[in-house]
């Protein structure tokens, strides 16, 4: 089944797809066999039926390609387009050492029929434009720079008072933040570093109800991700409070609520007497229909906790995630070296590379630096030896922090 954005042909593109669709419809309804030759981005399949041999070629790439087939054919071998829409060159030297040349447009499908049932394809040679490899190498460069840039993403400028240094409102409430009716959220000078420029928030509750501090509404990030960093400490080691780092919003009128727990409880990180940075990652934010998004900190039950310096990140990737990204890059690099054009392109067009292209901006300086580091690519030779494969892996490894490989 062929589907392009739905069950019907895309409106306005019928002319560009007419040859492909007509060819597909006229293929005989029999099983075709793939010619066992790696000639990416071209796939060649053949079938014999009704006293004729059918050959079709698919160009799985955005480049115009020239294909040469080494064949065995009858002595007289006219080439017929199965759709009757296009004219092709004749077979050269028809017979046991015949050859046939054909040019395929980007994403093209060509199918022809040959007389008799004895014709066969022995080999496939593909010639791509000179800039095809350069184009793939450039995309790989940009992907590498984007992946490395994930470790240096700045926090979002989304909170009005992330470090709590703004003066309190006239009613004593915390600027840029809201507490619930139970109270229990107040500004204090950090007693561990008494400095009037180092204000922190003290959340406290004497009863069992706890308290909540929430931010003003935020713009919903278009990445579908939001990481919350915050510094916490508690002086109550004997009765350590439980704290939730949470997001709240309305998702098409329904409550949206996600949280991570620290402090008291099993399998959670403890909140000690010294300042410690905590992190909660939320990866399932809806890309539409979400509004009134807020960060919230909940003191669950009685106790006391101090918090400071809240930071939000929309592109925070954990180390295991970055390692997986570099595995994709490594694989694409090896595919490119081996001339596996379609495999390389398929990796570059997969979800996470496309995601980084959409959300990680690159400066001209970053691109220029990476381009200057890359040698001009040569044409692919024979498959590299194992030592060469290790060289690529060592190169990728050198881009990652050493802690990835302990």
Model-derived segments and spans:
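Carbohydrate-binding surface patches
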Residues: 38-74
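Extracellular and organelle-lumenal recognition/adhesion modules and their flexible linkers in secreted
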Residues: 127-406
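Edge strands and adjacent loops of beta-rich recognition modules
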Residues: 29-42, 195-197
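C-terminal beta-strand-rich structural cap/linker in extracellular carbohydrate-active enzymes
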Residues: 94-134
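Aromatic/acidic polysaccharide-binding cleft in carbohydrate-active enzymes
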Residues: 1-26
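Acidic/polar loop patches that form or flank catalytic/metal-binding clefts of enzymes
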Residues: 8-14, 29-35, 67, 79, ...
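Beta-strand-rich binding/interaction modules
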Residues: 64-90, 241-245
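Short, solvent-exposed loop/turn segments at secondary-structure junctions
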Residues: 8, 14-15, 59-63, 109, ...
């Amino acid at each position: 089944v062929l589907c392009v954005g739905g069950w019907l042909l895309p409106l306005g593109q019928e002319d560009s797809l007419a040859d492909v669709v007509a060819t597909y419809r006229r293929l005989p309804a029999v099983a075709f066999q793939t010619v066992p030759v790696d000639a990416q981005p071209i796939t060649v399949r053949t079938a014999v039926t009704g006293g004729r041999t059918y050959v079709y070629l698919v160009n799985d790439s955005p480049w115009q390609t020239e294909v040469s087939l080494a064949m065995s054919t009858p002595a007289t071998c006219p080439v017929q387009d199965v759709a009757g829409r296009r004219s092709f060159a004749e077979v050269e030297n028809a017979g046991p050492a015949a050859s046939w040349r054909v040019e395929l447009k980007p994403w093209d499908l060509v199918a022809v029929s040959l007389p008799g049932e004895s014709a066969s394809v022995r080999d496939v040679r593909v010639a791509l434009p000179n800039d095809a490899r350069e184009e793939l190498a450039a995309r790989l460069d940009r992907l590498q720079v984007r992946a490395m840039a994930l470790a240096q993403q700045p926090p979002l400028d989304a909170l009005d008072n992330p470090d709590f240094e703004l003066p309190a409102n006239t009613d004593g409430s915390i600027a840029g933040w809201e507490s619930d009716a139970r109270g229990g959220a107040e500004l204090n000078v950090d007693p561990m570093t008494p400095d009037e420029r180092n204000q922190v928030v003290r959340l406290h509750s004497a009863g069992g109800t706890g308290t909540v501090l929430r931010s003003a509404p935020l713009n919903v990030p278009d990445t579908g991700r939001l990481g919350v960093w915050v510094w916490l400490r508690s002086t109550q080691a004997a009765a350590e409070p439980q704290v939730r780092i949470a997001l709240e919003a309305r998702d098409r009128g329904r409550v949206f609520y996600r949280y991570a727990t620290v402090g008291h409880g099993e399998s959670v990180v403890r909140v000690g007497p010294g300042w410690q940075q905590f992190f909660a990652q939320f990866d399932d934010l809806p890309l539409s229909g979400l509004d009134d998004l807020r960060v919230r900190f909940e003191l669950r039950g009685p106790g006391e906790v101090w918090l400071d310096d809240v930071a939000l990140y929309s592109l925070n990737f954990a180390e295991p995630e970055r390692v997986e990204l570099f595995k994709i890059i490594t694989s694409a690099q090896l595919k490119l070296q081996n001339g596996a054009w379609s495999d390389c392109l398929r990796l570059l067009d997969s979800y996470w590379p496309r995601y980084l292209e959409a959300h990680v901006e690159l400066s001209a300086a970053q691109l220029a630096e990476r381009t200057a580091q890359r040698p001009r690519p040569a044409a692919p030779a024979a498959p590299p030896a194992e030592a060469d494969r290790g060289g690529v892996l060592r190169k990728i490894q050198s881009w990652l922090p050493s802690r990835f490989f302990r």
